[in-house]
Amino acid sequence: MIETKVSKGIISTYFEKLERNLDLDVAIVGGGPSGIVAAYYLAKAGLKVAQFDRKLAPGGGMWGGAMMFNQIVIQEEAIDIVKEFNINHEKYEDGLYVMDSVESTSALLYHAVHAGATVFNCYSVEDVIFKNNTVSGVVVNWTPVLREGMHVDPLNILAKIVIDGTGHDLSLIHI
């Protein structure tokens, strides 16, 4: 039956993806623009990178632009990155450019994944693995599990490097 084939396809391929990412070069906590760009450049350099974002849709606050006007403004210093990600943009005033926030966020995610990064959405990092006086991984659980206060054991993911890309929250630092 097609229904069970669909379910088996989702379960088996997701399990394989998760298993492939239990031991990483780099774990990035947070799926905002800085974390996504870091994932892109690190994966492009050949490192095994996974990004963990607590939201259903990674991208941080970029989706909404400013006050849900889905336009964003960037400074001249970031224009080379915008061009590398092939994001449409137009000059606004001296040193400022405007772009569509939805296109921009989508482009960042698309390029990070195509460079080889794996993005896990709806994952919260609830702790870090600390061995030999160094952070050596993250402890993850599904965001809805934590939000509901369920007592469900997390999973451990090893990483040579852990990056806090949680933006304004600095969630990882407060663990």
Language-model features, listed with the residues they occupy:
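Extreme N-terminal leader/targeting segments of oxidoreductases
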Residues: M1-D25
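N-terminal Rossmann-like FAD-binding beta1-loop-alpha1 element of flavoenzymes
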Residues: L24-L47
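Glycine-rich FAD pyrophosphate-binding loop
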Residues: K44-M62
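N-terminal glycine-rich dinucleotide-binding loop that anchors FAD/FMN and/or NAD(P) in oxidoreductases
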Residues: G65-N88
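A conserved beta-strand/loop element that lines the FAD pocket in flavoprotein oxidoreductases
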Residues: A115-V125
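Conserved beta-strand-loop-beta-strand element in the redox core of flavoprotein oxidoreductases
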Residues: I129-L155
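Short hydrophobic core segments
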Residues: I157-G167
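Conserved small/polar residues in nucleotide/adenosyl-binding loops
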Residues: I173-I175
